[in-house]
Amino acid sequence: PIKRFDLVHEVNSRGSFALCQAALPHLMKSDAGRILVLAPPIALDPKWLNGTLAYTISKYSMSMLVLGLSGELAMDGIAVNAIWPATTIDTAAVRYNEALGGEEMVRRSRKPRIVADAALHILSQNKTVTGQFYTDESALMEAGVEDFEKYAVEPGMPLQQDFYL
């Protein structure tokens, strides 16, 4: 329905764009201008459009924002990159949505800390690193992390790959 489409685009697409625009004057004055967007790498697999069309389009528009702004802002010394979880993350969306698997899915997820640690690595890179799409896992491997078990909600449990990978 159009109401759902409008809502997810208002939050995801427009919200991300508006936040970036509002931050630009401050980022332009900074020697450490960085934008990190929670956006998936673009994988044009029809399975992501089946039943989640409005949400998927809104998330992919955020991915396009990363590509566009990284090109536009590179000469201003502002890096724009994206991060996306490699596995499901224990969030309220996963925990309380039975359609996503509820408690069983939580057990097969990682803690939110993995995304925070990966974001720290991405944001600490040279500002010439821009227009990149990282998974939390790939960013941490790049940072030298080898033990990912500490991020598991239930260590030893097989992990659920994220839905957009």
Say what each PLM segment does.
Residues 10, 29, 95-96:
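Phosphate-coordinating loops and pocket residues in cytosolic domains that bind phosphorylated ligands
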Residues 20-21, 67:
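A short, exposed helix-loop element centered on a Lys and neighboring polar residues
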Residues 82, 102-165:
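C-terminal helical subdomain
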Residues 1-18, 36, 62:
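Catalytic Tyr-X3-Lys loop
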Residues 7, 72, 114:
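Acidic donor-binding helix in nucleotide-sugar-dependent glycosyltransferases
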